[in-house]
Amino acid sequence: MNILDKIDAASLRDDVPAFRAGDTLDVHVKVIEGTTTRTQLFKGVVIRRQGGGIRETFTVRKVSFGIGVERTFPVHSPNIEKIEVIRRGDVRRAKLYYLRELRGKAARIKEKR
């Protein structure tokens, strides 16, 4: 192991649940506004997970008031308080970019049995 791997290993989180593209998540994000700190919930479908190690990220998509919102989070960020898996989705792709074009019921993902 070289020096960078040792530094990265010290920053890795161990409380990250197993999730993949198609799963519905609750991401609890720490938001700092001035002197106050609060937790903001972002709930949506994982459309991609990429990278590895300390640089690993995932993108969550939700529809808010009829507008699609996507947010990319680093998996090991200290600003993420916790990640909860709500539903396991049954998909055959690793990147679900096609969901951007779908509307309404067509954008739903089957639940894994």
Swiss-Prot record:
Superkingdom of origin organism: Bacteria
Molecular-function GO terms, alphabetical: structural constituent of ribosome
InterPro entries cross-referenced by the UniProt entry: Ribosomal_bL19, Ribosomal_bL19_CS, Ribosomal_bL19_sf, Translation_prot_SH3-like_sf
GO terms for biological process, alphabetical: translation
Keywords assigned: Ribonucleoprotein, Ribosomal protein
GO cellular component: cytosolic large ribosomal subunit
UniProt record similarity statement: Belongs to the bacterial ribosomal protein bL19 family.
Record's function text: This protein is located at the 30S-50S ribosomal subunit interface and may play a role in the structure and function of the aminoacyl-tRNA binding site.
Descriptive protein name: Large ribosomal subunit protein bL19
